[in-house]
Amino acid sequence: MTAQPPLHHRHHPYTLFGTSCHLSWYGLLEASVPIVQCLFLDLGGGRAEPRLHTFVVRGDRLPPAEVRAVHRASYAALASAVTTDADERRRGLEQRSAVLARVLLEGSALIRVLARTFTPVQIQTDASGVEILEAAPALGVETAALSNALSLFHVAKLVVIGSYPEVHEPRVVTHTAERVSEEYGTHAHKKLRRGYYAYDLAMSFRVGTHKYVLERDDEAVLARLFEVREVCFLRTCLRLVTPVGFVAVAVTDEQCCLLLQSAWTHLYDVLFRGFAGQPPLRDYLGPDLFETGAARSFFFPGFPPVPVYAVHGLHTLMRETALDAAAEVLSWCGLPDIVGSAGKLEVEPCALSLGVPEDEWQVFGTEAGGGAVRLNATAFRERPAGGDRRWLLPPLPRDDGDGENNVVEVSSSTGGAHPPSDDATFTVHVRDATLHRVLIVDLVERVLAKCVRARDFNPYVRYSHRLHTYAVCEKFIENLRFRSRRAFWQIQSLLGYISEHVTSACASAGLLWVLSRGHREFYVYDGYSGHGPVSAEVCVRTVVDCYWRKLFGGDDPGPTCRVQESAPGVLLVWGDERLVGPFNFFYGNGGAGGSPLHGVVGGFAAGHCGGACCAGCVVTHRHSSGGGGSGVGDADHASGGGLDAAAGSGHNGGSDRVSPSTPPAALGGCCCAAGGDWLSAVGHVLGRLPALLRERVSVSELEAVYREILFRFVARRNDVDFWLLRFQPGENEVRPHAGVIDCAPFHGVWAEQGQIIVQSRDTALAADIGYGVYVDKAFAMLTACVEVWARELLSSSTASTTACSSSSVLSSALPSVTSSSSGTATVSPPSCSSSSATWLEERDEWVRSLAVDAQHAAKRVASEGLRFFRLNA
């Protein structure tokens, strides 16, 4: 091991300017005094390069009860205790976490300053450079100085592989996947209770351009990763470990928790082998220790002396930077999420002098998270899922007298395999007009900057690559709810105040708003007033600027507003806030960058197009170009050719099998068909419905639309990313699998038998994936939109019949469709020669006919598709 050199280039002999990167528990010394070690980044003060150091900090003496809680048992022992029930085991974990968290966040006045990681501080050390004696927030340090210093360091990318023993079930009991879910919660917890372990470990660290592989006790390799310094403190010998060139360790969200824990245990044994002094605490808390699982978050209270976290996939891991790591840690608002509410900081809100009385803006506070979806009650008609689960044949919606905003909540069929119970419904909005997605770009960041001091959180740090500032701010606000209720409520109230006034102003100006998400994203139609057309973008921008100045005063303009994209007016809300439609629903890459929508089944994966998107296609991209297309330019391209033509099999020797390399052009779609996931493909097809259904369609035309979805599925049938879904732990039947994976949100695919198959992005697609479940779900969405569209047309025509006492009988063709001033499609009623009763009777008959036609088309095309998938499995 190499010895750490002494400190250099101080502004004062004992003073350093920099930032705390991580606090970890070293141990208890004499008189129950806790010792915390601090990984500190010295900014260098412009005289030297930034350097990493490890110091120790004394905590306040612990009471005997907390000392016993620390010494009594490790996290693993508490989680696997056989003499206690599940509730008692959880209480034991929470009690241990509360003691450790209190010391690491509030153990002393110095620790309270250093616990606010990645914010500038000034410290003073003793003469030997071992203990921090004083610490205070650094004033006048530019944000750019911290960002520039972090850019010189890396994140260590860790990948661990290994072997597992066979799990032998007792002879008298056979544990099916269903019984595992009922009795153990997750496979991971069952394995923990039975002493599951890993062996033959091999680990790889990538730091910058260097890669280090450890398969044995290679101290020479470890010396390049960690510097070791032995010091004497309070008559005790300590060994301080400092990372070389990196400030955090990242793993993929598919890394087995057991392998990760075993890897750090092995490194601990090597680094402290033969050490006669007191080693640091070695413990681990992860989702595998909870009976029903938890967030994919890891808490190593003692060793390693760096933060450890997961990112979304190997590709993202390889691009992780130190700035991303800082953003991830800042978003925790304290310790990793797995620690729970006890691991969050107390943040005091700023005292605001607002131009609006408190009772006017505080009423808009809500417990909903930052990514919550708010639906317009007049645009969406909600219905509970009925007991009759016939294949997508919902009852007609009641007539609320609102013909322009026709939405119904529809039961979905999943073939027995679906995410949690909220998956049982769809909520659909369809309107023949261009819907705009208006974004208030920096609203959340600017409100947070007004409400929280920079020493608690600085929203203006430059993040890069994986994380966007908004995602970091959103997660930080979410974590304020646990121990900083006043700050959380203040921020949520101000965001809600602006958001509610935006939607109210839209309604007053004659604009139909359909949905808002996260206080900053609005789906709005243009409108008309007595003076002419009204732009949704102009309306939102004006309202935001007005109420921003009303709240905060001054000449500072309000947050930036812009139309992010526009598309046909089709939106489907699937289950709990999952959106499907012809829009760019991008949800980040996990971690702090991941929206809440990404942590549930059906969150969209980021798709990429190799070139510019064609004008009629909106698919998933990381950044929207704004404006977008109508989504209806490729109307009837999928009507012919059959599955073999779409799959590219041609006449390949008479074989029924197809080539997996079929180009997207074979779909009859645009180049962008190769991007996004299966929900993106469905959303693209949904965007074609308004243009297609302006005239009465035949069964063959309906079949062509369903077949287009099927063609897209066939072309991507071997693409793992296309089919992946993200499932919550303990909520589904999961097939047995190697390792410890299903204890946290994990990636998987549906199986035909109703189970979930754990699926890695980096392995071949499971052979028994349930393509039929995906087809069933996609066709259910399309059928729901077709039915709602028919109701919109017919409710508009019903309003028109009130002007006359009778109507003519419907002809064989659908009556002509015109566009009203508000952009809503209307059906011209027949001439006043038949009674209104006859018109209503014919209307209901047409609705039933269209619904039945759509269902028959879906069943026929689904039968074709399932036969094809079976032949080409």
From Swiss-Prot:
Localization per Swiss-Prot or TrEMBL: Host nucleus
Keyword DNA repair listed: no
Residue segments, region Disordered: 394-422
Keywords annotated in UniProt: DNA replication, Host nucleus
GO biological processes: bidirectional double-stranded viral DNA replication; DNA replication
Keyword field contains Isomerase: no
Cystine residue pairs: none
Subunit details: Associates with the primase and the helicase to form the helicase-primase complex. Interacts with the origin-binding protein. Interacts with the polymerase catalytic subunit.
Family indicated by similarity: Belongs to the herpesviridae HEPA family.
Protein name: DNA helicase/primase complex-associated protein
